[in-house]
Amino acid sequence: MRAVVQRVSSSSVCVDGDIIGEIGVGFNVLIGISKDDTFEDLKYIKDKIINLRVFHDENDKMNLSLLDIKGEILVISQFTLYGDCRKGRRPNFMEAQGGEEAKKLYEEFLDLLKTSNLKVECGEFGADMKVKINNDGPVTILLDSKRNF
C-alpha cells in the first residue's frame, strides 16, 4: 500500500460538482492499493499516518501528530500511485489492485482510520474527482507498506 500524505490547512473533494468530503487542518491522503496488500499493510499505513509528527509544537518544531492536534483526514483512492514508468512513456498499472478487491481494502482502510476517533472524510472509490488541497508548509510524506521508499 502506498500513501501520499500532505499536511493541509483544508482540503475538499467533489464528484459531479458536489462536495462529498471536506476537512480543516490535518492530512489529505492519496491511497494506492497493490495486488499483494493485506490487512497488515492497511494497519501499517494507518498507524504511520495518525502518528506522523509533522505538526508544529509550542516551540515551532514538527513534533506533534494528527492525534495530538485532533486533526482531520481526507482520504482519496488513487490507483495511479502504482504507475510504473520505468519502461516507455505510458504508465503500466499492473501492480495496482483492481476493482472489487481494491474497493474492499479501501473501505477496510477507512474503517481502520475511523477507530482513531478522528474526523475521516473520503472521496468516492473509482469516481472522477476534483480535489482541492490547501497545502500547509508544504509538507508531503511518501509512505509504502513494503518500505520501498
UniProtKB/Swiss-Prot annotation:
Give the residues annotated as coiled coil.
Answer: none
What's one GO MF term for it? Answer: tRNA binding
Gene Ontology annotations of biological process type: D-amino acid catabolic process
Task: Keywords in alphabetical order, please.
Answer: Cytoplasm, Hydrolase, RNA-binding, tRNA-binding
Q: Domain of life of the organism in this record? A: Bacteria
Q: Name one Pfam family in it.
A: Tyr_Deacylase
Motif Gly-cisPro motif, important for rejection of L-amino acids: where in chain: 137-138
E.C. number? 3.1.1.96
Q: What is known of its domains?
A: A Gly-cisPro motif from one monomer fits into the active site of the other monomer to allow specific chiral rejection of L-amino acids.
Stated family: Belongs to the DTD family.
Its job: An aminoacyl-tRNA editing enzyme that deacylates mischarged D-aminoacyl-tRNAs. Also deacylates mischarged glycyl-tRNA(Ala), protecting cells against glycine mischarging by AlaRS. Acts via tRNA-based rather than protein-based catalysis; rejects L-amino acids rather than detecting D-amino acids in the active site. By recycling D-aminoacyl-tRNA to D-amino acids and free tRNA molecules, this enzyme counteracts the toxicity associated with the formation of D-aminoacyl-tRNA entities in vivo and helps enforce protein L-homochirality.
Q: Supply the name of the protein.
A: D-aminoacyl-tRNA deacylase
Annotated organism of origin: Clostridium beijerinckii (strain ATCC 51743 / NCIMB 8052) (Clostridium acetobutylicum)
What taxonomic ancestry is recorded? Bacteria, Bacillati, Bacillota, Clostridia, Eubacteriales
Q: Which gene encodes it?
A: dtd
